[in-house]
A protein has these predicted regions:
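Hydrophobic alpha-helical segments, chiefly the membrane-spanning helices
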Residues: 1-393
């Protein structure tokens, strides 16, 4: 019964949005932001459950990658909209980078930490041991993170970045697809969908994709614009609203799905979904921004980042480095999760250039310290580095 209520509730939010959208029932920016945001929120749940069911038909690692990709589709829609508008109005470039950097930092600082802390609170396990098959995610996250430092250095996002990052994403998906296939254990709404049989579950999945996809497509622009209008109305800095509130709405279903995995004791699936999402955001999402900008602008000119945007990118890259070092030994402890969360929270309130530089340097210093003083972390990081091939003979 609970699963039915979850499904009905999730279906109701995008369905209600269609009524609002086509009748113009919402009044004012707050009402429009609430209605469109709720549609994106509900669609995120539907897409996550559909992607969980996909594990019945494809390798587990690929299913987790697809789950992560689909689960962040709401944020992709909002961020790509900002990048598209930036091609017509350069002021929107700041919002595109704000949403992307905020989403990435929320994913690691809140999502990753919540996964481990839930396992500890519910099952009294002080650490998560990652399966070796998640080396795929860790290796590609290392590659994408290393490349991400080039973006603040050159101060632009260009079509060349799109080509490189899209190639990384495709390589990651292919690598995930070669992983061993395991039959998943489904619970809740995803288990209810799976009970419909092969034809039934695929039909329901297609219906979910159509409903949720349509809701996200029609709600992305109203949500983005109404959020900016709310900031102007209540004198809240628009950059911060877009950086934290927009990704919080679009990524909340993903966080909740990961926490539900953790509550069931499925630690590997919980953190695996979130690490896959981080890879997807650093590759496909970041790569999509200059492509959308170029198409809208009608030229191959790059998106030019100002000083604040470059600092935000650097801070986001530094956080990824620290997170990578933490999980490079395939073990994620309660203490490490608390540190990740504790380092993230001050960023919500300390927004000066000095604070951004300070946080970035602190992440990098802590990562270096762990590598220096932890033999297991040092071995894990060494395994992430490319090795020269030995010549035969």
């Amino acid at each position: 019964m609970r699963s039915v209520l979850w499904l009905v509730g999730a279906f109701t939010l995008p369905a209600a949005w269609f009524v609002v959208h086509f009748t113009g029932a919402a009044s004012g920016p707050v009402g429009l932001a609430a209605a469109s945001g709720a549609a994106i929120f509900g669609s995120g749940f539907l897409l996550s459950w559909a992607a969980e069911v996909a594990q019945l038909d494809v390798p587990r690692a690929l299913a987790l990658a697809v789950l992560a990709l689909i689960a962040v589709a709401p944020e992709y829609a909002v961020d790509v909209y900002f990048a598209w508008r930036a091609g017509q109005d350069p002021a929107y470039t700041a919002y595109a980078t704000a949403n992307m950097t905020g989403g990435n930092r929320l994913l690691i600082g809140v999502g990753w930490a919540a996964s481990v802390l839930t396992i500890w609170l519910r099952h009294r396990r002080r650490a998560i041991s990652l399966p070796r098959e998640q080396a795929v995610e860790i290796n590609y996250l290392a590659l994408a993170t290393a490349y991400s430092f080039l973006i603040p250095l050159k101060g632009t996002l260009s079509v060349l970045d799109t080509v490189v990052l899209l190639a990384m994403f495709i390589a990651y998906m292919l690598a995930a697809g070669r992983s061993h296939h395991e039959e998943p254990t489904l619970e809740g709404p995803s288990e209810l969908i799976a009970r419909a049989g092969k034809i039934g579950r695929r039909t329901v999945t297609l219906g979910i994709l159509a409903l949720a996809g349509g809701a996200i497509y029609t709600a992305a622009e109203p949500f983005a614009e109404s959020l900016l209008a709310v900031g102007r109305t209540f004198h809240i800095e628009e950059f911060l609203l877009v950086q934290w509130l927009a990704p919080l709405v679009s990524e909340s279903p993903e966080f909740i799905v990961a926490v539900l995995f953790a509550l069931r004791g499925a630690a590997a699936a919980s953190i695996g979904t979130l690490t896959s999402s981080t890879v997807n955001q650093w590759t496909l999402l970041v790569g999509a921004l200059p492509a959308a900008f170029a198409l809208s602008h009608g030229s191959l000119d790059p998106m030019v980042l100002d000083r604040r945007q470059r600092e935000e990118m650097l801070l986001t890259s530094a956080q990824s480095v620290f997170a990578l070092v933490v999980i490079s030994n395939f073990r994620f402890t309660r203490g490490e999760a608390l540190v990740l969360f504790s380092l993230f929270v001050p960023q919500l309130f300390l927004t000066s250039p000095l604070a951004r530089w300070g946080h970035a340097l602190l992440y990098l210093a802590l990562a270096a310290g762990i590598v220096c003083f932890s033999p297991t972390a040092r071995t894990g990081v060494r395994n992430l580095l490319p090795r020269p091939r030995r010549r035969a003979g």
